Amino acid sequence: MLGVYLPIIVLVAVAVIFGLASLTFSSLIGQKKPSAVKLAPYECGCEPVGSARERFSVKFYIIAMLFILFDIEAVFMYPWSVLFKRLGIFGVVEMGLFIVILFVGYIYVWKKGALEWE
């Protein structure tokens, strides 16, 4: 039983060891000379304008959450579409219920005005 999972365990161990070794060596070897230029926020090579600690509207976060929600919907629908014939009527009903729940949530968000940009 362990033989089946041994390659995955080795892969995870190598990844963790490599990550920790990279962090350790970079902190030991890297230069630690902070200056005002190094601590300034980077804006695509342009001179920084204003403060980097600016507040954003909540609407940006709502749109981001909706994007993630519908991205997850696509993640669930892809395997369902691949296994469509094997799942039978149960799979169709289950995915239909999932889409209806998402659609009701979308209508709720729309009625609340979260998609209105003013």
Swiss-Prot record:
It is a multi-pass membrane protein. The chain crosses the membrane at residues 1-21, 60-80, 87-107. Its EC number is 7.1.1.-. Keywords: Cell inner membrane, Cell membrane, Membrane, NAD, Quinone, Translocase, Transmembrane, Transmembrane helix, Transport, Ubiquinone. The keyword Aminoacyl-tRNA synthetase does not apply. Belongs to the complex I subunit 3 family. NDH-1 shuttles electrons from NADH, via FMN and iron-sulfur (Fe-S) centers, to quinones in the respiratory chain. The immediate electron acceptor for the enzyme in this species is believed to be ubiquinone. Couples the redox reaction to proton translocation (for every two electrons transferred, four hydrogen ions are translocated across the cytoplasmic membrane), and thus conserves the redox energy in a proton gradient. It comes from the Bacteria. Its main location: membrane. InterPro entries: NAD(P)H_OxRDtase_bac/plastid, NADH_UbQ/plastoQ_OxRdtase_su3, NDAH_ubi_oxred_su3_sf. This is NADH-quinone oxidoreductase subunit A 1. NDH-1 is composed of 14 different subunits. Subunits NuoA, H, J, K, L, M, N constitute the membrane sector of the complex. Coiled coil: none annotated. HAMAP family: NDH1_NuoA. It is found in: Cell inner membrane. It catalyses: a quinone + NADH + 5 H(+)(in) = a quinol + NAD(+) + 4 H(+)(out). GO terms for molecular function: NADH dehydrogenase (ubiquinone) activity; NADH:ubiquinone reductase (non-electrogenic) activity; quinone binding.
